[in-house]
Amino acid sequence: LICLSGKKITYDSLVVCPGIQLDWNKIEGLKDNLGKNDVSCNYSYESAPYTWEMIKNMKKGTAVFTNPSSPIKCGGAPHKIMYLACDYWQKQGVLDQIKVHYVSGAGVIFGVKEYAETLKGMLEKYKIITHFQSDTYKIDGEGKTLYFRTKLNKDQLAENFKSSN
C-alpha cells in the first residue's frame, strides 16, 4: 500500500473477491493476472486451486485478502479463506512471519452483529490489519502491486506483494 502520505506496506500474495457478477474487468489488471503473479480468486473455478497453492507455499511476507463493497455471492467467503490461511500458517509455525491485511469495502467486519463479535476476535487472534471502506481498483501483477481507494480519508493506496518465500 502506498498512502498519499508516502507510507508503504507490502504483501506477497493477494486473493481478490471482485463481486457477485464476476466482472473480472471491474478491477483493472485482474483478468490478466488471475491465476498467476500471486493473484487468485476463489470465485474462479480455474484459479481457486491456485489460492491454496499460494497459501501452502507462503512462509513469510504479506498476504492481502479483499472483499468488495458491491454485493457478493457469499458474504463469508472472503473471511473463510483468510481465516483458513491464517490457521494453516499458524499450524505451520509461520504466521508470525506473515503480515495479513484485509481490504474491505464494508464499514465493519461483518454485517450481522452476533457474528461480528466473534470475527473481531479472529482478527485479533491472527493480528490481521484491516482497511475498511476500501475498494480495490487496480492490480499490477508483474509489478506485484494492488491499488485501492478508501472512503474514510480518500487516500489512494497501493500494496506491493513481491514474493519472499
Model-identified regions with their sequence ranges:
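A Rossmann-like FAD-binding core segment of flavoenzymes
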Residues: 1-2, 90-165
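Rossmann-like dinucleotide/flavin-binding elements
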Residues: 23-110, 159, 165
